[in-house]
């Protein structure tokens, strides 16, 4: 027999599906939420639903956007000759926090991982190749987390792009298997400054 009422148990179950939320955190969040005023919960639910319905992907770089082009792609002050390739929108956010990078981005939407059934076809690799060729990009910076999948993706994408442009990768002060989103701004800034050509 559960100590929770069915609606509360269902809420806890759904909260546990969020990244980094275990049973105890889900319980704490659920109990907090049900004690909030109904108007506050309604506003929260409305904001959540609106974000899900209105936030999509930029048609150029595949970063998060509620319009055809994201804020970064629309910014005329950005260096349009440089594209930083990342796996996930969280990586764009992490790099933007450094305030060091002034170019554009391309979000692959994941990493090549044959064990998980993810090949280049499931990612935005071909869109990147077309973009680099059409826009006559001067440099592509590979800013992919250092893992087996990250290395595979970096080398694969780098080989495809070499006929069109200079391909570099950020230098890493990150441990192998570390994620960009967890790195501090100083580490990321140094990694951008220390990038080197892909061999």
Swiss-Prot record:
CDD domains: TOPRIM_recR (cd01025)
Keywords: DNA damage, DNA recombination, DNA repair, Metal-binding, Zinc, Zinc-finger
One GO biological process term: DNA repair
InterPro entries given in the database record: DNA_Rcmb_RecR, Rcmb_RecR, Rcmb_RecR_Znf, TOPRIM_dom, TOPRIM_RecR
Protein name: Recombination protein RecR
Occurrences of domain Toprim (ranges): 81-175
Family: Belongs to the RecR family.
Zinc finger (C4-type): 58-73
Role played: May play a role in DNA repair. It seems to be involved in an RecBC-independent recombinational process of DNA repair. It may act with RecF and RecO.
PROSITE patterns: RECR, TOPRIM
Record-level Gene Ontology MF annotations: DNA binding; zinc ion binding
């Amino acid at each position: 027999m559960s100590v929770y009422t069915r609606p509360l148990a269902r809420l806890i179950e759904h909260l546990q599906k969020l990244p980094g939320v275990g049973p105890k955190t889900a319980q704490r969040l659920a109990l907090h939420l049900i004690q909030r005023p109904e108007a506050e919960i309604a506003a929260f639910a409305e904001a959540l639903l609106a974000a899900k319905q209105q936030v999509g992907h930029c048609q150029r770089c595949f970063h998060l956007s509620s319009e055809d082009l994201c804020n970064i792609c629309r910014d005329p002050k950005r260096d349009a000759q440089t594209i930083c390739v990342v796996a996930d929108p969280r990586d764009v956010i992490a790099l933007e926090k450094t305030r060091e990078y002034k170019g554009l981005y391309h979000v692959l939407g994941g990493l090549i991982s044959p064990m998980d059934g993810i090949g280049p076809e499931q990612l935005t690799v071909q869109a990147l190749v077309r973009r680099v060729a059409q826009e006559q990009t001067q440099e592509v910076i590979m800013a992919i987390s250092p893992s087996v999948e990250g290395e595979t993706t970096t080398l694969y994408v780098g080989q495809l792009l070499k006929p069109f442009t200079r391909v570099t990768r950020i230098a890493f002060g990150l441990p192998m298997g570390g994620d960009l989103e967890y790195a501090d701004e100083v580490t990321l800034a140094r990694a951008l400054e220390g990038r080197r050509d892909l061999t």
